Each structure stands twice: as C-alpha cells, then as structure tokens.
Amino acid sequence: MTTPVSFHPQAFIELALSRGVLKFGEFTLKSGRVSPYFFNAGLLNDGEALSLLAQGYADKLTQCENVDVIFGPAYKGIPFVAATAVALSQTHNKSVPWGFNRKEAKDHGEGGVLVGAAVEGKKVWIIDDVITAGTAIREVVTILKNAGATIAGVLVALDRQERGQGELSAIQEVQKELEIPVHALITMKDLMDYLEAKGEKEALANMQAYREKYGI
C-alpha cells in the first residue's frame, strides 16, 4: 500500500482541475454573482481524490489544538470525515473518533440525529468542503452544542476570500459570531498563484477583477 504524501495546494489544485472539481470560466453563483471559477467538492468521488483531500485535512488537524472528535455534516461531509480519520491513523499515528449527523432523526435503533463517536463533553472539529453563506455550519454547530459538545473549530477545503452581504467573508462572519477558528486547505489566493505560475493570463485577470470587486 502506498502511503499518501503530505498535502500540497498545487497538487490538489491540479487534481481538482483534472476531475472537474475546479473550473475556470464564467459561473453564476446562488448569490447572483458571476464568478470566474467554480468549485464542487462532490466530484472528489474516487479513491485518489478523496485520499488527497483527507490527507490535507489530517495534516492541518495535527497543527490544531483540542481535537477530541472530528465531525462531518450530512451529507457531503460524511465521506470527508471518515477518510480523514483513516489518514490521521495511517500517516500521523493518531486514532481520532469521528461522527456525523443525519438529516432526519431516527426513532428506532440508535435513534437521534447523531451517529458515531459520542460528542458530549468533547472538543469537536467540523470538516466540510466550503462555507458559502454559513447557514449549514451554524445548523450543525447548534446540533453539536445541544448534544453537549464544545466546537473547537472548522476545517474547509476552500476559502473563497470574498465578502458576504457585508464587509466580512462568510468564514469571517462564522469566526466572529461563533468565536471559533476556521481553517482552509486552499484559498482564492492559492488559485491565483497557480494561474500566475502557469502563465494563464486571461483567467488570472478575471480572478483579479473579481477579487477587486468582492474580495476581502
């Protein structure tokens, strides 16, 4: 079995481009903004791609404090958190409990909306793909707090580094409101650095214009 190498943003960007996870062009977002790039982590749907993403989360978590439990919000976060637990064990020799939530509560069997490791009295890191408006993260934070957990922080794959409705980005709003750290594996700046290194002048110019208009 090949041991995954350490996560590098450029390698992840190249893999994301090859899988169609990351695209440069013209895309209308739910907010109505026309973005020069699009990121869909749901297309990280093979072993190699998921392994590299999980390695990134695992590497980042080893630099974080208070990692009692890692948690993946339903549904997209579930494979991410499971793969991250494996990566932590295989490459960092850390056996970290993990869990996730259901969208609908069960009234039989183990019941409830939480599945996996117990979170009561634990410091929990949430693992997800992106924070767009912050609505989903706020919902899962409420669920975890109601179960007696302390939220230690959030890890996401991409920080778009753009303003929400106000002057802050969605990530900055979550950090300020919930008083927790939010870390990202790659940022919009990483994407721009990649385009510059590859000599992709048109795509880079589009990114620069977008960042000047909406960036933080």
UniProtKB/Swiss-Prot annotation:
GO terms for molecular function: magnesium ion binding; orotate phosphoribosyltransferase activity. Keywords: Glycosyltransferase, Magnesium, Pyrimidine biosynthesis, Transferase. It catalyses: orotidine 5'-phosphate + diphosphate = orotate + 5-phospho-alpha-D-ribose 1-diphosphate. SUPFAM superfamilies: PRTase-like. Pathway: Pyrimidine metabolism; UMP biosynthesis via de novo pathway; UMP from orotate: step 1/2. GO terms for biological process: 'de novo' pyrimidine nucleobase biosynthetic process; 'de novo' UMP biosynthetic process; pyrimidine ribonucleoside biosynthetic process. Transmembrane segments: none annotated. One of its GO terms (cellular component) is cytoplasm. Its EC number is 2.4.2.10. Gene3D superfamilies: 3.40.50.2020. Belongs to the purine/pyrimidine phosphoribosyltransferase family. PyrE subfamily. Homodimer. This is Orotate phosphoribosyltransferase. It comes from Acinetobacter baumannii (strain ACICU).
